[in-house]
Amino acid sequence: INTFQLKQYSDCLSWKDIKDPPFLLCWSGAWITAETTKDNIRVVSDSLTAAEAKRGNDKRSLKSLVSYMDMADKWAGHNIKAFDSKKVMTRLILNHQSCPDLTVKQIDTLSLVKKYCKNDSNALGYWLERLGQIGKDKMESEDWDKCKAGDQKALNKMLRYNKQDVRGGVILLLELHDFLLSGGVDIFK
């Protein structure tokens, strides 16, 4: 199983307000095995270079993401079905790249918490705080703009934020797996 998260510039605009098309800034993922615990999560990632970000060119990073995705028997993430997977597919088709294997099972932790739980919020950061985990750094609007302008410091901050998302997503996934397995549901099958 691998899990991944994306960070993309321009996620929430009216199409009339889009001056520059959105593109992938970075991606991060982690392999999950039977030995994976919240204390030994190894994150892999790729980020645009400053020059790529200035041009909005995510082609190279997309290739590395698809290579990573193609090695997995399952994909997992918080809202992966409604957001991450669809954003990847959009960027791939717009970059005239091949599609990863769409028969791979997707484990969506957002769908799972909505199906089995009723928390005050279903945001990943909120779940992690409630589970006693360290919260996520904050990305401000200006950080996103700096990334798009090719600011290396902002791109590094975005990648750290993205890696935190993956670590948090794995922690929630492992918690959900153990909890649901105790009730007879194996989300990894």
Residue ranges and their predicted role:
Residues 189:
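Cys/His-rich short segments
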Residues 22-32, 39, 45-46, 74-186:
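Metal-dependent phosphoesterase core characteristic of DEDDh/y 3'-5' exonuclease domains
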Residues 1-70:
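Conserved RNase H-like, two-metal-ion catalytic cores of nucleic-acid enzymes
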